[in-house]
């Protein structure tokens, strides 16, 4: 496999030679807009991780509302959530309706939504208040943007993993990419993660030398973007935290086996604290 090539190395070296020290660069307009939109979403969306109250496996059923419930909700009468044959229903004094995965509905001053795999559906509950801290980023580094091919997976198939939001999904092994970083070439596993009913993204969940010292200890996600001609872009400036970095309501993905970069990847989202205690560094998923 031809290793990934940094698309900005030549211009970066030229800048050093002609202009002296290189100053921190502002992110490209598209990235700046995406970060601003994400900040707005965290601050205002009803299903923002900063508004999370609980996320639990529905199992044989969940009781919501009263203080002794599985999920106590102030001011909410007793409701029950159940799953049967992959379908989730909400039953209460004035409501009897299905919960469609990925579509939050109001319950008093709260929002609830269902997600996850059939037979293992989970219920997420969001409240009116925001807790925790928003997103913070390293200065933009054009030297951590790479492009190149993706090799086929060593073992094609599917594997169950926790996605960005801590919900179990069935991901497809998409392949591997090789990145020259920190003086060595690192091979990273890529998986296709479902993001909606008919949507998916190529994702890499990785650890690096900043974990626990600038970034979330468990690792970060970054999306691999298809380009023309069978190539892909990997931009570590777009690395982002799993939702468990924002709230302890979310379970935390275990690091993917082999996806560890010894060097410090000082790009993308930082960690400001306040999330779930991360899985031990030695604990890896398949």
Task: Tell me the role of every PLM-derived stretch.
Residues 52-101:
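Forkhead-associated
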Residues 169-215:
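Mid-length scaffold segments of soluble, non-membrane domains
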Residues 20-24:
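Sec/Tat signal peptide C-region and signal peptidase I cleavage site
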Residues 91-140, 271-273, 277-278:
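C-terminal boundary/linker segments immediately following FHA domains
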Residues 211, 231-233, 237-286:
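Extended, aromatic/histidine-rich regions of cofactor-dependent oxidoreductases associated
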Residues 7-19:
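Bacterial N-terminal signal peptides
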Residues 25-70:
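N-terminal cleavable signal peptides for secretion/export
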Residues 115-171:
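Surface-exposed beta-loop interaction hotspot
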């Amino acid at each position: 496999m031809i290793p990934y090539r940094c698309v900005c190395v030549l211009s970066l070296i030229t800048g050093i030679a002609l202009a002296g020290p290189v100053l921190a660069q502002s992110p490209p307009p598209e990235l700046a807009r995406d970060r601003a939109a994400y900040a707005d979403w965290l601050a205002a969306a009803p299903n923002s991780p900063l508004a999370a109250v609980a996320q639990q496996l529905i199992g044989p059923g969940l009781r919501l509302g009263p203080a002794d419930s599985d999920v106590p909700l102030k001011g909410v009468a007793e409701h029950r959530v159940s799953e049967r044959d992959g379908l989730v229903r909400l039953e209460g004094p004035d409501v009897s309706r299905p919960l469609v995965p990925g579509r939050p509905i109001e319950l008093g001053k709260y929002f609830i939504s269902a997600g996850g795999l059939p037979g293992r559906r989970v219920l997420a509950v969001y409240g009116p208040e925001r807790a925790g801290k928003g997103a913070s980023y390293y200065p933009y580094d054009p030297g951590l943007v790479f492009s190149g091919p993706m090799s086929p997976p060593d073992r094609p198939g599917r594997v169950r993993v926790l996605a960005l939001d801590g919900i179990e999904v069935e991901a497809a092994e998409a392949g591997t990419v090789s990145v020259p970083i920190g003086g060595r070439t690192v091979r990273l596993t890529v998986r296709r993660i479902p993001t909606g009913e008919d949507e998916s993204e190529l994702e890499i969940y990785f650890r690096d030398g900043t974990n626990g010292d600038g970034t979330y200890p468990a690792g970060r996600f970054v999306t691999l973007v298809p380009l023309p001609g069978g190539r892909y872009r990997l931009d570590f400036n777009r690395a982002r935290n799993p939702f468990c970095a924002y709230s302890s309501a979310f379970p935390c993905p275990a690091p993917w086996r082999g996806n560890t970069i010894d060097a410090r990847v000082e790009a993308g989202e930082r960690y400001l604290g306040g999330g779930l205690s991360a899985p031990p560094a030695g604990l890896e998923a398949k």
